[in-house]
């Protein structure tokens, strides 16, 4: 079917191919190859066609489980992902951990039971691909005024940061005055509803610096070194969901048409995130 489709006609692809040596489907097919290398080669041939039919700003979500052979976990999902990057120019944006929250009873006496699978998000272009992050954000709590003080969505009132500014032995007097003013400005923005939450990192206050303390590696560290402080502002539309999704698998009991069905919720989030309205999945 893929071979008959024109180039760049699909907005979003979500798929989960047959896993290696897990099930025998009617007519054979992929997943029953003699070696895992042959299995991966066959997958990549199909994925190459996916790359062709996917639009430049489209997304490809690939859910694939792992397999054991000769007592060895084959690490198939990541072998596939790395070859996609190295050989087909796919750009990997996320590895989602699908936490199934339950699993089949493990009979192994020398390895752990597995209750997760990876789901990779690939794109063809580093920037500009369709991504509706606001559609899946966690709804933020609201800021408020308590006892005459502005309190952020997570309870930050400014009192603690004023104390840290006051006690810092590494701030110059000019930096200290600037820090007080900047904090007041941020609290005023919270009061007006322009921001919902923030964090303030102050030099000499024994706080962890974002991305490390070395200025040549972290822009935040350089800002801390130059100004004596910096702010982290939370998105007013809420925080982004994480890359761990807790979704219970579909119940397979009594099924006749397919014994490895996709949970609807596992498909729903990728489509909401990366398929534009009226797009083709």
Language-model-derived ranges and their functions:
Residues 1-281:
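Core catalytic lobe of class I
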């Amino acid at each position: 079917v893929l071979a008959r489709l024109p180039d760049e006609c699909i907005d979003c692809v979500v798929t989960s191919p047959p896993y290696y040596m897990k099930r025998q489907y009617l007519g054979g097919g992929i997943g029953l190859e003699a070696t895992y290398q042959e299995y991966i080669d066959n997958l990549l041939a199909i994925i190459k066609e996916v790359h062709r039919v996917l639009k430049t700003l489209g997304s490809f979500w690939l859910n694939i489980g792992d397999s054991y052979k000769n007592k060895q976990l084959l690490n198939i999902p990541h072998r596939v992902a790395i070859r996609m990057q190295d050989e087909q120019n796919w750009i990997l944006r996320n590895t989602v951990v699908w936490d199934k929250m339950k699993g089949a009873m493990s009979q192994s006496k020398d390895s752990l039971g597995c209750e997760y699978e990876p789901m990779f998000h690939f794109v063809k272009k580093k920037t500009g691909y369709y991504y509706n992050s606001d559609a899946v954000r966690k709804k933020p709590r609201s800021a408020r005024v308590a006892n005459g003080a502005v309190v952020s969505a997570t309870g930050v009132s400014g009192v603690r940061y004023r104390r840290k500014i006051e006690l810092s032995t590494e701030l110059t007097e000019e930096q200290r005055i600037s820090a007080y003013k900047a904090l007041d400005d941020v609290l005023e923005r919270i009061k007006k509803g322009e921001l919902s939450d923030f964090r303030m990192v102050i030099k000499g206050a024994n706080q962890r610096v974002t991305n490390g303390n070395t200025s040549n590696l972290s822009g935040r560290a350089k800002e801390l070194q130059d100004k004596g402080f910096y702010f982290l502002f939370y998105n007013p539309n809420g925080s982004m969901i994480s890359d761990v999704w807790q979704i219970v698998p579909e119940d397979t009991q009594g099924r006749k048409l397919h014994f490895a069905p996709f949970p609807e919720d596992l498909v729903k989030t990728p489509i909401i995130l990366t398929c534009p309205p009226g797009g083709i999945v």
